[in-house]
């Protein structure tokens, strides 16, 4: 019989995070949610603010047991202030992961939810690398706020940085844990209206059309997160998995929806 794993999920109170919590709980794993508010009753709850390093450190200290899987799902949209976007979506996530990985069991996994908004990281690699190699949370947020004009740009850059940093971190921690990202397109979550506000229907609607006329469901993203955290994904490391029904690639290639 497979032993139950200890799983930490950030942002587990709603949306994709809630679906991730339910997936692991249904498989008999012990789940701890780090969030600003309680969520699924199937999980233990620890209050944590990913925009505050001291809050992150306190949450890590409260775990009190080895961790097998970390799922970084918490995030804010481009409708939020630039500093908050950079803090929650990347620098807080990075701080939490760096604090937690040394406490993780060998053979564990870190899966972070990025976005197809980070698809073009290669086009901005110099700027992205500056964020990735920022020495700490405060310095990184300062670098980002000085160079990014609005929330939409900050959201994109935060997800680009997450994808690139994960590749670096996968090499740093290789042999101990695996790190990968999952990049959804538009997903039906409570946060989706904010994405329409910040990115516009003109940008998101074509992706929905190319995906077959609907947005993703939280459970469809959670299933990929669960796979990457499993032993079946043991040879996947430092990789970004796009989960958008092929929409971003179709858009990039200029393909029309078949009649």
State each model region's role.
Residues 13, 17-22:
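N-terminal Rossmann NAD(P)H-binding glycine-rich loop of SDR-like oxidoreductase domains
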Residues 40-54:
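Rossmann-fold cofactor-recognition segment
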Residues 77-78, 83, 106-176, 186-187:
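Catalytic loop of short-chain dehydrogenase/reductase
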Residues 125, 237-259:
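Short C-terminal tail/terminal secondary-structure segment
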Residues 176-178, 236-238:
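Short, small/polar-rich loop/turn modules that mediate ligand/substrate recognition or access, typified
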Residues 184-194:
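Short, flexible catalytic-loop segment of classical short-chain dehydrogenase/reductase
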Residues 210-221, 232:
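A conserved structural motif in NAD(P)-dependent oxidoreductases
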């Amino acid at each position: 019989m497979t032993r139950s794993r200890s799983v930490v999920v950030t942002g587990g109170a709603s949306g994709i995070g809630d679906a991730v919590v339910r997936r692991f709980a249904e498989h008999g794993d012990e789940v701890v949610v780090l969030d600003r508010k309680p969520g699924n009753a199937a999980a233990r709850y620890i209050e944590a603010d990913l925009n505050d390093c001291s809050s992150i450190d306190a949450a890590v200290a409260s775990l009190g047991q080895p961790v097998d899987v970390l799922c970084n799902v918490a995030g804010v949209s481009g409708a939020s202030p630039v500093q908050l976007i950079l803090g929650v979506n990347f620098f807080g996530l990075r701080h939490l992961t760096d604090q937690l990985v040394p406490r993780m069991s060998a053979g564990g996994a870190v899966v972070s939810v990025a976005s197809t908004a980070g698809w073009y990281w290669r086009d901005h690699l110099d700027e992205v690398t500056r964020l990735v190699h920022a020495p700490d949370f405060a310095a990184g947020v300062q670098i980002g706020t000085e160079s990014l004009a609005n929330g939409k740009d900050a959201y994109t850059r935060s997800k680009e940085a997450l994808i690139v940093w994960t590749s670096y971190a996968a090499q740093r921690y290789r042999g101990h844990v695996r790190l990968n990202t999952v990049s959804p397109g538009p997903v039906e979550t409570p946060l989706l209206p904010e994405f329409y506000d910040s990115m516009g229907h003109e940008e998101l609607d074509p992706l929905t059309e190319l995906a077959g006329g609907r947005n993703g469901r939280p459970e469809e993203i959670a299933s990929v997160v669960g796979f990457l955290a499993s032993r079946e994904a043991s040879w996947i490391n430092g990789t970004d998995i796009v989960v958008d029904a092929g929409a971003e690639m179709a858009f990039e290639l200029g393909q029309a929806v078949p009649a």
